[in-house]
């Protein structure tokens, strides 16, 4: 998996081992960020990547000009991969990596954009949207 566009374009992002985490595909990330960029929302934005997994969404946001990203991930294996990806890409100064439940921690964040790609069986979208203080949720 690679960063699709921006300053980190083409750089590799590792996926967590196993089948518990399914990273957001390049095609989905490209479509998401094309839509966000068409609204001029990403540049200098404060972003949260909930259910972060590998961190692909938040890393893509930073690559495309977001000021910073707070990543929230509760799975220990995915958290380690996320931490390693952020370090390997030199994004420590623009990233905050928080271990924990996105549903609990996500509502307390002061950000402009919330990016969320939860597990397939996630059924709490209304709760997540109600708890989020961001201007835009994708």
Label each residue range with its predicted role.
Residues 1-138:
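Class I S-adenosyl-L-methionine-dependent methyltransferase catalytic core
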